[in-house]
């Protein structure tokens, strides 16, 4: 159970394949994330699929950004952020999520969702 785990070592990725790890201390590992990502990507109802898949799990901001990138438009990304907000392990990286959005109004909405003043 990710909530109760002692902080894990941050993965630096497989240098041979130049795959960058999206894992951070306290978040699910890359393999588990890829499973959730693919399930969500292949689902017609992405938000509800994701909501079920991340029960009792924490994600890194990088993992959240990858999931949000399944959508093109900020409004859809913000809906996904609403699902993800209580599952973010590295809250110090919220700015990465906010800055990924295209419009100032979307950035402000993301701050509101994340509880950033």
Residues covered by each model-derived region:
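General marker for long, soluble alpha-helical cores
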Residues: 1-117
């Amino acid at each position: 159970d990710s909530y109760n785990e002692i902080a894990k070592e941050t993965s630096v990725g497989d240098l041979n394949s130049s795959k960058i790890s999206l894992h951070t201390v306290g978040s699910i590992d890359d393999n588990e994330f890829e499973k959730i990502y693919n399930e969500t990507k292949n689902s017609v109802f992405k938000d509800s699929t994701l909501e079920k898949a991340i029960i009792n799990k924490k994600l890194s901001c990088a993992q959240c950004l990858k999931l949000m990138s399944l959508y093109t438009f900020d409004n859809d990304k913000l809906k996904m952020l609403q699902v993800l907000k209580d599952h973010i392990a590295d809250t110090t990286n919220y700015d990465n999520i906010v800055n990924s959005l295209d419009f100032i109004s979307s950035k402000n909405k993301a701050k509101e969702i994340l509880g950033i003043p």
